[in-house]
Design a protein with these regions (language model features):
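Helix-to-loop junction immediately C-terminal to a conserved catalytic motif
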Residues: 54
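Non-catalytic connector elements of ABC transporters
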Residues: 253-422
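ABC ATPase nucleotide-binding domain helices that frame the ATP-binding cleft
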Residues: 47-50, 146
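The feature captures the beta-strand-to-loop junction immediately N-terminal to the Walker
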Residues: 39-41
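ABC ATPase nucleotide-binding domains
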Residues: 35, 76-82, 86-237
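Conserved ABC transporter NBD signature motif
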Residues: 61-70
Length: 422
């Protein structure tokens, strides 16, 4: 059984444990050949969603389709799904070869095909020299690679990954991501990958769905989520360090413009945003500034004016490969902590000193303080259209703007609709 041309469709999916809905009215359309990532904090419902797709948990309400076929009542073994878990789930009494071959043997695959596929998978995951060993003779990273090889050696309708790289060190994790992407493109079937690591989600996902408390927050490419988050939660969750948030008021300026006023600064609203911000004059809003959009005035690669800076007291300096991350606090009676990711090193002598940082005003975000929904974003890095990265049924990536299914488009374009209403 395979998803055919329709991919995987999830309609109004609900999973309850007692009175609590851990997955609440979830709607998704996973395209054929797409590597789709579910990301969110612990307890958001992402692993439960994966288990519902696999048939390991009964559906409380809603529908799951593989292609045109409703699979709600189909047994896990009959869904033709391959799973990789964080806890390896390999058989301790079998050799590495036997573990990898287990699923193929259970489906009575020819011996020559089993040998060929096991050899190819072992080569891809660099475990050829381990085929005769038992799991107790392997390291944690080697066991995880065996689990990946066992799941990916067979032809499945859907591949499911539940934080499979969490137990690997940084170098192995990076290599394993490349291996998963390589094999995914070869297979050409849809895959759903669960992680709490937003960096991993950005690296792997053709599209990413952000979940919180069982509810879908937003679906889009990594760039779309980063530059056009639909609410404050997505804005803070996607990005490291998280976005800075300041409570500001919109005030008219003497020259007929508008300013975002905070006890520590009075930032001018760029001319291209004036019409969209004007309806909020006199109201409180939450201003979002990404850490990399704060730079020393003389080193900024964007337009800087005297009144487009925020002064802060340097509390911590963390050197990075390309610059440094600086933790500061505003100079008001009640200091507000914020963070800047600088492209240049800041000497340790700046600790405890006051420094000005220029704000890239064309990259600001504004949110409603009541519900956290986005009201305004600056333009995308490339153009004003939401960017999607889709894949063809063969698994080859096809870059460029692409249309979303209606249920997802309504979620990820909520902020755009609010901007137009303004």
């Amino acid at each position: 059984m395979g998803p055919a041309s329709g991919g995987i469709v999830i309609e109004h999916l609900v999973k309850r444990f007692g009175e609590r809905a851990v997955v609440d009215d979830l709607n998704l359309h996973i395209q054929p050949g797409e590597l789709f990532v579910l990301v969110g904090p612990s307890g958001c419902g992402k692993t439960t969603t994966l288990r519902l797709l696999a048939g390991l948990e009964p559906v409380s309400d809603g529908r799951i389709y593989f292609g045109e076929r409703l699979v709600n009542d189909i047994r896990p073994r009959d869904r033709n799904v391959a799973l990789v878990f964080q806890d390896y789930a390999i058989f301790p009494h079998l050799t590495v070869f036997e573990n990898i071959a287990y699923g193929l043997r259970a489906r009575h695959a020819p011996r020559n095909l089993i040998r060929e596929r096991v050899a190819n998978a072992a080569r891809l995951f660099r475990i050829e020299h381990l085929l005769g060993r038992k799991p107790r003779q392997l390291s944690g990273g080697e066991r995880q690679r065996v689990a990946l090889a066992r799941a990916l050696v067979r032809d499945a309708a859907l591949y499911l990954y539940d934080e499979p790289l969490a137990n690997l060190d940084a170098q192995l994790r990076h290599q394993a991501r490349e291996d998963i992407l390589t094999l995914h493109r070869q297979k050409g079937q849809p895959a759903v990958y669960v992680t709490h690591d937003q960096a991993e989600a950005m690296a792997l996902g053709d599209r990413i769905a952000v979940m919180r408390d069982g509810k879908l927050q937003q679906v889009g490419s990594g760039l779309d989520l980063y530059e056009r988050p639909c609410n404050q939660f997505v804005a803070f969750f996607i990005g490291s360090p998280g976005i800075n948030l300041f409570e500001v008021e919109v005030h008219p300026d003497q020259d007929g413009g508008l300013r975002l006023v905070h006890p520590a600064f009075r930032l001018p609203v760029p001319e291209e945003f004036q019409a969209r911000v004007a309806p909020y004059t006199g109201r409180r809003l939450n201003l979002g500034i990404r850490p990399e959009h704060l730079q020393p005035p003389k080193r900024a690669d964007f337009a800087v004016s005297e009144d487009s800076t925020i002064r802060g007291l340097v509390n911590v300096i963390e050197p990075t490969v390309s610059g440094c991350t600086v933790y500061l606090s505003t100079l008001e009676p009640t200091p507000r902590d914020f963070v800047a990711t600088l492209k240049a090193r800041l000497p340790g002598s700046y600790l405890g000193r006051e420094v000005p940082l220029a704000v890239n005003l064309r990259k600001i975000h504004l949110f409603d303080p009541e519900d956290g929904q986005a009201l305004l974003h600056g333009p995308l890095a490339t153009d004003d259209r939401p960017i999607r990265v889709t894949v063809s049924p063969s698994g080859e990536p096809a870059n460029g703007p692409a249309e979303q299914p209606t249920s997802e488009r309504e979620t990820s374009e909520a902020s755009t609709q609010r901007e137009e209403q303004a």
